């Protein structure tokens, strides 16, 4: 069938090409719409004749009428032109649409039908030839290029091969190359004809020996295998967080008759279903029956909550409304706003009450960004109501740190500090933030920032900054910031600046001239600069007199002639720094660097007696200028803070002074693993010598992680420096402070004796001799003759050296000097307690002769008569009198401590020592249960008074003292239980329970944690330990629970590995690893995610060491660079990385140099030393 039926017979009648050319009206631009009427009439006639069965007549068209119609406008077109333009446009659109549809249908018929009749095909070819002739007549210039024209039009319609005259023009040569053929080495897959194979066989191959694998998609339908989701996927984690549906039982009224058995109801006893015409089988429930009847549920049923989730949502909505009401009524309550912010976590964890539909709950619950935005919106509302609240602004900055850029966050910090320059907590947070930004960090920048902070706060404290008043606790906070700066410089390797800061602060605090005391701090610092640059000996140096003496000398005029001491020998220099040049280069660098850190921690100054100048210094970094320390000098007016300054200085020098940094910078300063050492405590649990370093190293110490921390002292020059500090500072103190400082000096020497006992026994004799000489010299001073603390340490020293009889003589002499003070003297109780404990630990048998000596000591303590040496067993009467005296003294102390709100200091001082002596006395005379009863009685009495949870600001001092007393008593309790377990058979459960209760109250006590980890390591039940650690870490703000939880898991892993090895070789265990490695890694990640753990160098060192021990080098590198993002100032991290990754030595040194950390041995100097 032709495309246009009106010209079907025309194509058959006319064979001439001229008619076909002129009748090609599809391409004739002169065709008009008026021809449509005549064409449609001819089509109707042809259709009518075809339906009657007669052959269609042949029409003969005359060319001239068609030409005239085509050359001029027809009457029909003129009539149509006079109609409205709107109808004309509509007809054109309709005609084009019909033409498009017919053309599309024609192409489909041509492409799909291959069995059309020859007659129809001839008609189609004739009509196409007529149209082609008409195009040739209209374009005579083209002539013989008809085939080219047809080929050009091939992009618009189909072309029959018979219509083309010259077959050579069918194909066209494209001379433009296709770069894709060269690039992909094959044709584009869209240009390759596709076909479908039927079957996978191939002719000509042997099916038994050969096979062809056809590429392409298989005809079989692929079934997607859905893997089961595990518990840690997002969907399942969300399900785990949802609240479980409460299951409520239906309790039946209890019968009075005794029940002999509990009957089990049978399902057959259930009520038989009721049948009806609607429910003939009785299988429909009530809801289905109502639906079949066209009814709905009852009104009361529809109003009831359909699930537990609805009730929870209703309760949660009520809490939200309550919070909104309360903050609307009390917009100035900042704590209420903070509680509202914390409440958003609970709202987002709940099954989203604000969800828009199903599935939205999980998205809302898991969307961290949505949670942060909600919290931020609440905080912004709170700040609008309280524009002066620093706490709310700090909370906002901490929240914005999750999704703000560091640069934007730093600008907000600076704006906040500009508005509140007198807020010390704000300064502390800002310094910690800047200290942990690796991109912008450098030692000099942060050092100047510390100086700016301290100088600004000094101006506020002096009143120079009139716009902002002084806040309470400013001086204590300034001292804490000063210590934080010193620890920062020590960890960065700049030990010389740390020592110079303490030297300047001691002179600025204790040797200040009277003429400048009333001046502002800034002016005092200006007067101090000439003294610092004068070359006068400073604190710790020989001949130091202080700032005041130098000022008097300047006012009198003249000069002081310094003569060299001829008795002193020259300082012994190291023979050579590199002892073995065959070692790898990184090992040599680490050894030399650590050696220089140990020897060169004091600032270098030119020796005028040797005519030295500043140019003689080989390392300019060892010289400290006044510009490096001037801004950090602060004024301390409190005597307690002045004494803490000396204690902190001695602690930096390695002296066990008992000083701990403030809580704000404690974990920033923690960088060594001495908190896990428990060897001495295991040997002697009662008389354990605790140096109380708390994981903080001293100056000049850059040791490897895991090496035991011994107080072995410094070299000769360093020891002389420490002695000079004591000699200069001791005359400045008096009373209890001087006694405590003398005790610290003696404990420092005893610690070196203990080091010699365990490592170098060759030096034990000389070290013991010098230590006894110091003790005797201190006791010879008039104010120390009755100092029982010094007598106690001297006797303990003799006992450690093995001189038991001499130690007993010292103890007896000290106790005979006490007189009749009885149980009211704390120092006397401590002396007697140590004496009795040493006697108990001397004999392995608790019922031996030494036990009688211990009972004698504790009994004579209660008597009013002077003390007498041990002569024999104590009588039962004396024991009963002593017990009665202890009871009365304990009741008296407890009554005084609990009666008044601020407990008296005298009662608190003697209470702890008295309870410990009484517990030991009861243990020796009755047993361990009696001692435990004393502990329980005291603990129950003082627990409510101590307010362990949250002491108020007005009674924080008294509560802290009571807490310290309880902590000391708890430690005595655990030590006594451990000692009893060593000498007798005793269950482990009481000790475990005691430690658990104590650690919940004192989560920062490292001694208790060490004992807990050790006893739990002997147990095979790890679940209780893990649950306990999880409970403490969730509630406590300290970092010690995390550290000891990791240590406990590492000990367990070490135990499992030791069992799986025989003779040093690994045994293929049949049991799995139990996931200890993943558990330890998860503990590390959770600890680092906390606020205090993120900036703790010790935690990062432990994490890096653990991953290296597993052999995963790439992951260890990632953790190292992650640690640098949080602690870029810690030099020990870089040195650990050099030991773990020797190939990265140059890169790590470049980073250290870029961040301005102290590098004492550049690689260039190392090469020169190796060449020599």
Curated annotation (Swiss-Prot):
Q: InterPro entries, per this entry?
A: HAT, NRDE-2, TPR-like_helical_dom_sf
Residue segments, region MID/MTR4-interacting domain:
171-275
- Which Gene3D superfamilies does the annotation name? Tetratricopeptide repeat domain
* SUPFAM superfamilies reported in the protein's UniProt record: TPR-like
**Can you quote the domain comment?**
The MID/MTR4-interacting domain is necessary and sufficient to mediate interaction with MTREX.
Q: Locations of Polar residues compositional bias? A: 71-83
Its subcellular locations are: Nucleus speckle; Nucleus, Nucleolus; Nucleus, Nucleoplasm; Nucleus
Q: Where is the composition biased (Basic and acidic residues)?
A: 120-139, 300-313
The protein's gene is named Nrde2
Which GO terms of the cellular component aspect does the record hold?
nuclear speck; nucleolus; nucleoplasm; nucleus
Q: Subunit arrangement?
A: Interacts with MTREX; the interaction is direct and stabilizes NRDE2. Interacts with EXOSC10, EFTUD2 and EIF4A3.
Tell me the Gene Ontology biological-process terms attached to this UniProt entry.
Answer: cell division; DNA damage response; mitotic cell cycle; mRNA processing; mRNA stabilization; positive regulation of RNA export from nucleus; RNA splicing
**Ranges of biased composition (kind: Basic residues):** 84-107
Q: Which residues carry this modification: N-acetylalanine?
A: 2
* Superkingdom of the organism of origin: Eukaryota
Q: Which family does it belong to?
A: Belongs to the NRDE2 family.
Q: Please give the function described in this protein's UniProt entry.
A: Protein of the nuclear speckles that regulates RNA degradation and export from the nucleus through its interaction with MTREX an essential factor directing various RNAs to exosomal degradation. Changes the conformation of MTREX, precluding its association with the nuclear exosome and interaction with proteins required for its function in RNA exosomal degradation. Negatively regulates, for instance, the degradation of mRNAs and lncRNAs by inhibiting their MTREX-mediated recruitment to nuclear exosome.
According to the record, the residues making up region (Disordered) are 46-144, 292-313
Q: What is this protein called?
A: Nuclear exosome regulator NRDE2
Q: Cite the entry's keywords alphabetically.
A: Acetylation, Cell cycle, Cell division, Coiled coil, DNA damage, Mitosis, mRNA processing, mRNA splicing, Nucleus, Repeat
HAT repeat start and end residues: 314-346, 404-436, 766-800, 986-1018, 1075-1109
Query: Coiled-coil intervals in this record?
Result: 78-330
